[in-house]
């Protein structure tokens, strides 16, 4: 399938920013197709980006013909851009949807997918690890990283207010200085070097 060029298109909103207050406004969103439900006269496309999901509603009798035809080619995990009008609705959990006026297919995914990105069909851990990129797109996994981020950010802020500073110790060292630890030699600008195994020695010096 021939994909479209992004061209002059630039995202105006993330999915989490599409709210009922934008009713009647034109927006441009970018993301991946998470799910598709085709009911004949109406097609629902759930688009996901890093912030969450938003529903794209294609009405066969009201949506431009070229948009209807293009959405017929969509499959899960296709990368798309959607330009359309925000509409308030009580039919979605978030109370909002986007009625598209133009759709661009920016990338395609090879099918069948190794796992169900909707989560309806559970996958065992081996499958999830083999398809880690897809697995990490699940909201449950993304939430873990967000919690970690907030916790680390709060910890850094707390310690910074107490006068602590954050340092980054070397990751590549010039000589074997870590006792009996297994060493991993690397060529670094035509010189022998090693990957540091532990920041212990550097942190001991900083404490002093």
What is each PLM-predicted segment?
Residues 1-208:
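Class II aminoacyl-tRNA synthetase catalytic cores and aaRS-like
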